[in-house]
């Protein structure tokens, strides 16, 4: 666990963030939020990414809300003991007291997703009490516009299982106004496909909100990471598959982005 909350680099430095989707105590990776494949032990994987120079780490318990489970604090405590970079934790957050419990377990930032939909005031209350710098609102968005129409994306919750009827761009604006310090934006259409970010979604939300946007969903190669911050205008890029299964290391990603003239933190 780091003692510094929020991004440690300058606002212009782009961050690379490995993501650990966790269920039943194991890191998994799926495609379009389904067909999950085991990727390993979360503590071991977290330690590896810390050693590789990741800027931050995101840990998401992807079935806590849909299963109605409590927070998996023991695993979070173990992960936090192995990393010395900002750790964002999400999944199963239902009330402000859950935010405090996760911070006490070693998290630096808390990601709120489904609970923000059912109780938007939770975001405001958590930000007022703990500070916007440690509140992240996660948005899982699916494109719902037809070909030829203006692009539209809908927010889904409960691990992508429930449609909300909410427009993703408008929701991001609202959450930023309520005090979210960052938006973690995942394209459900691109998740696990390795076909690249939904750059139109990323750029539209990045341009619409005054807080950093973390692009997520679809990274399959190094070029995709660079596109997330150049074309997509994201402040940070999040990936899982290319790291979990040994396709690239965090250092390789940073070296590639630096060669493209993108400001990244190099060890």
UniProtKB/Swiss-Prot annotation:
Pfam families: His_biosynth. GO terms for molecular function: imidazoleglycerol-phosphate synthase activity; lyase activity. It is found in: Cytoplasm. Its EC number is 4.3.2.10. It comes from the Bacteria. GO terms for cellular component: cytoplasm. The active site is at residues 21, 140. Pathway: Amino-acid biosynthesis; L-histidine biosynthesis; L-histidine from 5-phospho-alpha-D-ribose 1-diphosphate: step 5/9. The keyword Lyase applies. InterPro entries: Aldolase_TIM, His_biosynth, HisF, IGPS_HisA/HisF, RibuloseP-bd_barrel. It is an enzyme of class 4 (lyase). Keywords: Amino-acid biosynthesis, Cytoplasm, Histidine biosynthesis, Lyase. GO terms for biological process: L-histidine biosynthetic process. CDD domains: HisF. Its main location: cytoplasm. It catalyses: 5-[(5-phospho-1-deoxy-D-ribulos-1-ylimino)methylamino]-1-(5-phospho-beta-D-ribosyl)imidazole-4-carboxamide + L-glutamine = D-erythro-1-(imidazol-4-yl)glycerol 3-phosphate + 5-amino-1-(5-phospho-beta-D-ribosyl)imidazole-4-carboxamide + L-glutamate + H(+). Belongs to the HisA/HisF family. PANTHER family: IMIDAZOLE GLYCEROL PHOSPHATE SYNTHASE HISHF, IMIDAZOLE GLYCEROL PHOSPHATE SYNTHASE SUBUNIT HISF/H IGP SYNTHASE SUBUNIT HISF/H. Heterodimer of HisH and HisF. This is Imidazole glycerol phosphate synthase subunit HisF. It comes from Bordetella avium (strain 197N). The gene is hisF.
């Amino acid at each position: 666990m780091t003692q510094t909350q929020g991004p440690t680099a300058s606002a212009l430095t782009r961050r690379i963030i490995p993501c650990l989707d966790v269920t039943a105590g194991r890191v998994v990776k799926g495609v379009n939020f389904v067909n999950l494949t085991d990727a390993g032990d979360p503590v071991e994987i977290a330690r590896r990414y810390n050693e590789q120079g990741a800027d931050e780490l995101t840990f998401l318990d992807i079935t806590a809300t849909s299963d109605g489970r409590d927070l998996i604090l023991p695993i979070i405590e173990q992960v936090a003991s192995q990393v010395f970079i900002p750790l964002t934790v999400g999944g199963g957050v239902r009330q402000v007291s859950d935010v405090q419990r996760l911070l006490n377990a070693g998290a630096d930032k808390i990601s709120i997703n489904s609970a923000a939909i059912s109780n938007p005031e939770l975001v405001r209350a958590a930000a007022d009490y703990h500070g916007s710098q440690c509140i992240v609102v996660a948005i899982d968005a699916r494109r719902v516009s037809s070909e030829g129409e203006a692009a539209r994306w809908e927010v889904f919750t409960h691990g992508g299982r429930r449609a909300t009827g909410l427009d993703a761009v408008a929701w991001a604006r609202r959450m930023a106004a309520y005090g979210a310090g960052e938006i973690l934006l995942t394209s459900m259409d691109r998740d696990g496909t390795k076909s690249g970010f939904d750059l139109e979604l990323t750029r539209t939300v990045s341009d619409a909100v005054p807080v950093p946007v973390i692009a997520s969903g679809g990274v399959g190669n190094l070029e995709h990471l660079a596109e997330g911050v150049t074309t997509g205008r994201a402040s940070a890029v999040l990936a899982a598959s290319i790291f979990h299964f040994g396709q690239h290391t965090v250092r390789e990603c940073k070296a590639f982005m630096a060669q493209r003239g993108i400001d990244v933190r190099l060890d």
